[in-house]
Amino acid sequence: MEGPLIEIVTDPFPSDDAMQRLWLAAWGGAGPTSFEPILTRSLVHVGAYDGALLIGFVNVAWDGGIHAFILDTCVDPDYRRQGIALKLVARAQEVSRARGALWLHVDFEPHLEAFYRQCGFGPTAAA
């Protein structure tokens, strides 16, 4: 439950065990065997912690230029509906801009549209 111990951390490089625990709780299945190759190539990744426990995560992949992509936004079900995902995405947006991303993209399932609109995302047409 959110309280004064929830901390949003930029580029925390969580352990594979911490990521696997969160991945299983949030997605219902195992994640990649190792997250290191993913995280070391990210423009930024952001974690939410309750003390030492990783309870939320978002990753931003990029093309090495001006386009970046929000991926894997998740929060442990015991901590959902407290604004943690909004804080994760907001930090990811802020750091992505500071690191040179001019375009930040996200693909999502239809039931997440309201959430991503609340984060400031909207549809764009390819030119």
Label the predicted regions.
Residues R117-A127:
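Conserved acetyl-CoA-binding loop of GNAT-fold acetyltransferases
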Residues R81-E94:
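Conserved acetyl-CoA-binding loop-helix of GNAT-fold acetyltransferases
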Residues S96-F108:
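Conserved GNAT acetyl-CoA-binding A-motif
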Residues S34-C74:
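A conserved beta-strand-loop-helix scaffold within acyl/acetyltransferase catalytic domains
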